[in-house]
């Protein structure tokens, strides 16, 4: 049996007031699904540095990491995803979508109203469990 590829990513749970930023994927096999924005951790890069870089590249804003929320491990059919999640705030810039088809700010009780990627469903559980 062939070893499954393991992808390590960092995700930003961006908070503004009592709302969370969610983005709609604009590419790939999971196009159209919603997620917490972020991306792959590059070799030699910390997860915190990766999430700051990815958000700057994808959304054109600078963020500050407030705290680590947790790690989600999820088995997709094609790969194993290890996603480190951080609670963040935007410190400068205006959101410009460079890779996503949509973005919206949702209250915690509205997070179940969009079709999240499976791993991101687990992030919603972390948010709700943290009482954030």
Model-derived segments and spans:
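Beta-strand scaffold of nucleotide-dependent catalytic cores
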Residues: 22-24
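The catalytic Nudix box helix
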Residues: 36-68, 107
């Amino acid at each position: 049996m062939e070893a499954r590829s393991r992808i390590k990513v960092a995700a930003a749970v961006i908070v503004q007031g009592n709302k969370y930023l969610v983005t709609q994927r604009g590419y790939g096999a999971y196009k159209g699904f919603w997620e917490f924005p972020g991306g792959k951790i590059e070799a030699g890069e910390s997860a915190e540095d990766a999430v700051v870089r990815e958000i700057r590249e994808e959304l054109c804003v600078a963020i500050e990491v407030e705290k680590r929320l947790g790690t989600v491990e999820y088995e997709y059919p094609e790969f194993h995803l290890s996603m480190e999640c951080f609670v963040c705030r935007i410190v400068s810039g205006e959101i410009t979508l460079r890779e996503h088809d949509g973005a919206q700010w949702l209250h915690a009780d509205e997070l179940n109203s969009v079709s999240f990627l499976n791993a991101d469903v687990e992030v919603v559980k972390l948010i709700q469990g943290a009482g954030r």
